[in-house]
Amino acid sequence: MLFFSRTTRWVLAPLADRLDQPDQACTPLSSNNPLLRRILTGVEQLLQERSALKEQARALTQEVTQLDERVACRDALLRQWEARWALVSHGAGELFWELEVNGTAAPSLACAMRWTGSASILAPGIDQLGHWNEQLHPADRQRHLDTLARHLADRSGRTPFVLDVRIQPPSGDDYRWCRISGDSRRDAQGLPVAMGGSLRDIHQQHLQDEVLELAATRFDISREMLHDGLWDIEVVAGDPANPKNTIWWSSQMRR
């Protein structure tokens, strides 16, 4: 059994109280006994370190709370912008795409592609450049890759990427004409780091252009068969004598 002197007990009792309530302010303990003095000094240092750590933990907790609030605000803002983008892309009648180019002018057919929008001309699962290229008409596939490579290889960024291609719909129906266009973001050396664009169905417009071109060809043939000359005038501001009026003459009028 260990026995303590009265002096030792006189020191240990307040030390026990100090350890029971370490955060309560009190006068530092002291003793004439060298061993007790070392113990009291060590305990006081540990309590001070504990207090400092608690203060640091309190500050870190407050900082984490502030960061959580900022992250929550950013998440709310992100969801808001995502909802706006979904609304815009859904109402645009176009598909929007992103291509991972990885800083190369000749992207691999395995490069990832992401699509957003509501158009139904694209088959599901088109998540790579190669899969997308396979959906094009065989006569358009290499032309599509060549146009893409020329755009990415031009470090000045002046070569556009705009191309009319034929796409086979998921239903397996006849190919439809679509226009794919895009642009790339480049680093300081002009190497592409990101690329994106849109895909728009222009099939009806293409058919109308063909009809218009056929009508123009027929008109030219009919005009050449006539012996009478034809002419028309574009009247500016309703003034037949306006010198800015444009007059067109058929070839018979020039003979």
From Swiss-Prot:
It comes from the Bacteria. Pfam families: PAS_3. This is Uncharacterized protein in P47K 3'region. The lineage of its organism: Bacteria, Pseudomonadati, Pseudomonadota, Gammaproteobacteria, Pseudomonadales.
